[in-house]
Design a protein with these regions (language model features):
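Interdomain hinge/lid region at the active-site interface
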Residues: 167, 176, 213-274
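NAD(P)-dependent dehydrogenase/reductase Rossmann-like domain
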Residues: 271-293
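Rossmann-fold dinucleotide-binding core
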Residues: 5, 96-175
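NAD(P)+-binding Rossmann beta1-loop-alpha1 motif at the extreme N-terminus of oxidoreductases
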Residues: 1-63, 88, 94, 124
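Rossmann-fold NAD(P) dinucleotide-binding segment
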Residues: 50-62, 67-113
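Active-site-proximal catalytic alpha-helix in oxidoreductases
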Residues: 129-137, 158, 163-194, 204-217, ...
Length: 293
């Protein structure tokens, strides 16, 4: 019999995850504080509360923006653990500071359940195309027992080891992402200032040795000033970078490029580009170059 999966958080990442699982024949029950019309239209079953998911599902996954949100849906009056279930596996797909993950894990285990630290990486379109990467960590037994669920969410779910390893890998990955986006903006601004054709730059540089996935995704957006629809808002990058910096500082690892990137993303919060796609960071680079795109 197919597993019942509870999914809390049906936003830009959660909704395509739900659709992927439903397409693989998994019965997905979801909870979101706002409307769940798209989820229902995809074949999902709405739940009245996180507690209801804890009572009826074989496994519960959370994909939420902050530790406060995760704590509320797990430990609140109508939270998952209010169900009183023992042995329930909970997979947190959120990107949170490691100390917060550890704190949440301790509370989950005290309630007799198991938490997997399994942040997901990728923009919504990547997730919808089954190309989002899940960095799974925690109990290998729980991962193996629920491999079908992980494989239903994406074609790229990796088990990395002990709890917390997933978040560490996500921080390393996102360090690259933040730097690659800014590097793409800097290089393209240089090319524009040198009089190179915009479309030709995108066409020639995308398959070149200097390319990256972020260049391939965002160079066309930068050159067309197309910052909507939003794949990932600049404000989200600005929110997450302090976590990466703290992680590196705690390890005594200098990250000069990340610090420069952080300055740009922080500046962007005070601009009209804060809630536009992070490709709009090129506007600040252009401003520093005293040029118009």
């Amino acid at each position: 019999m197919a597993k019942k999966v509870g999914l809390i958080g049906l936003g830009a990442i959660g909704q395509p995850l739900a659709a992927n699982m439903i397409a693989k024949g998994i019965e997905v029950h979801g909870y979101r504080r706002s409307a769940m019309d798209a989820f229902v239209a995809a074949g999902g079953k709405p739940a009245a509360s996180p507690k209801a998911l804890g009572e009826s599902c074989d496994i519960v996954c959370t994909v939420l923006p902050s530790e406060h949100d995760v704590e509320a849906v797990l430990f609140g009056e109508n939270g998952v653990l209010a169900s009183g279930r023992k042995g329930l596996p909970i997979v947190d797909l959120s990107t949170l500071p490691i100390p917060d993950k550890d704190s949440i894990r301790a509370k989950v285990e005290a309630a007799g359940c198991e938490l997997m630290d399994s942040p997901i990486s990728g923009v919504p379109q990547m997730v919808a195309n089954r190309a989002g990467i899940i960095f799974a960590s925690g109990s290998k037994a729980v991962f193996d027992a629920n491999k079908d669920v992980f494989d239903a969410m994406t074609d790229k779910a990796f088990y990395l080891g002990e709890f917390g390893t997933g978040t560490k890998m996500k921080f390393v990955a996102n360090t690259l992402v933040s730097i690659h986006i800014l590097a793409a903006a800097e290089a393209l601004a240089l090319g524009v200032k040198a009089g190179l054709d915009r479309d030709l730059m995108v066409k020639v540089l995308s398959p070149s040795a200097g390319s990256s996935l972020q260049f391939q995704v965002r160079a066309p957006l930068m050159m067309n000033k197309q910052y909507e629809p939003v794949l990932a808002p600049t404000s989200l990058m600005s929110k997450d970078i302090p976590q990466f910096l703290q992680f590196a500082d705690d390890l005594g690892c200098p990250t000069p490029l990340l610090h420069v990137a952080a300055e740009y993303y922080t500046r962007a919060l005070e601009t009209p580009w804060a809630e536009k796609d992070v490709a709009s960071i090129i506007e600040l680079v252009a401003e520093d170059n005293k040029m118009k795109l």
